[in-house]
């Protein structure tokens, strides 16, 4: 199964250099976001795609991501870092362990 990357130019180039050949670049313009939504729908329907990596900023602009078992859709930080940071980590710990971690 293939790993696919969707994101900004810098992130996509990095993953191409790491060996991911199926990569799609999108900026955050309205037209590009619509193209990204369509590409994501297309990728989710393919049988040969196992993991879709998508930058957090692009995923946020797309809105609701498909809720599917396969392919696995993973949000990754871009060159500016995570937009979720501690909040996401707290939620993951809360779900996994059943307790809320606070400072």
Swiss-Prot record:
Keyword hit for Ligase: no
Membrane topology: Peripheral membrane protein
Highest taxon, organism lineage: Archaea
Annotated coiled-coil segments of the chain: none
Alphabetical list of SUPFAM superfamilies matching this protein: AtpF-like
GO cellular component: plasma membrane
Record key words, sorted: ATP synthesis, Cell membrane, Hydrogen ion transport, Ion transport, Membrane, Transport
Any one biological process term the GO annotation gives: proton motive force-driven plasma membrane ATP synthesis
Localisation per UniProt entry: Cell membrane
Gene Ontology MF annotations: ATP binding; proton-transporting ATP synthase activity, rotational mechanism; proton-transporting ATPase activity, rotational mechanism
Family according to the record: Belongs to the V-ATPase F subunit family.
Function description: Component of the A-type ATP synthase that produces ATP from ADP in the presence of a proton gradient across the membrane.
Assembly and binders: Has multiple subunits with at least A(3), B(3), C, D, E, F, H, I and proteolipid K(x).
Protein name: A-type ATP synthase subunit F
Gene: atpF
């Amino acid at each position: 199964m293939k790993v696919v990357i969707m994101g900004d130019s810098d992130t996509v180039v990095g993953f191409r250099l790491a060996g991911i050949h199926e990569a799609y670049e999108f900026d955050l313009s309205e037209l590009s976001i619509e193209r990204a939504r369509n590409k994501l729908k297309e990728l989710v329907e393919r049988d040969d795609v196992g993991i879709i990596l998508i930058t957090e900023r692009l995923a946020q602009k797309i809105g609701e991501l498909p809720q599917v078992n396969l392919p696995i859709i993973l949000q990754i930080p871009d060159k500016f870092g995570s937009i979720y940071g501690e909040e996401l980590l707290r939620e993951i710990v809360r779900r996994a362990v059943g307790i809320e971690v606070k400072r």
